[in-house]
Amino acid sequence: MGKLVKHCHTSLHSELVILFYAKNRFCISIDHLRPLKSHRTHGHYCLLNFSLRENKNYLIIVYLPIEGFSANHMCISHGTSFNIK
């Protein structure tokens, strides 16, 4: 148990990223992520200015893309799942 229920469902024209999860674990699609400019490592992306909102069966990440990096950016690896704090 604890595996992902479903991979992320995203919309290219929306600011909402819906993440289906199970056992408090989820993964993020790279559709709304931008590659890290400060690293040359492949597979690392950054989600800027985000906030988590919990709903019945999914999480919604609301974000505002900006140029450069802010204090509340989150770097992840493609396909990586992690715990919700």
UniProtKB/Swiss-Prot annotation:
Key words of the record: Cytoplasm, Meiosis, Nucleus
Subcellular location: Cytoplasm; Nucleus
GO cellular component: cytosol; nucleus
Segments traversing the membrane: none
BP terms from Gene Ontology: meiotic cell cycle
Coiled-coil portions: none
Function: Has a role in meiosis.
Protein name, as recorded: Meiotically up-regulated gene 144 protein
Lineage: Eukaryota, Fungi, Dikarya, Ascomycota, Taphrinomycotina
Gene it is expressed from: mug144
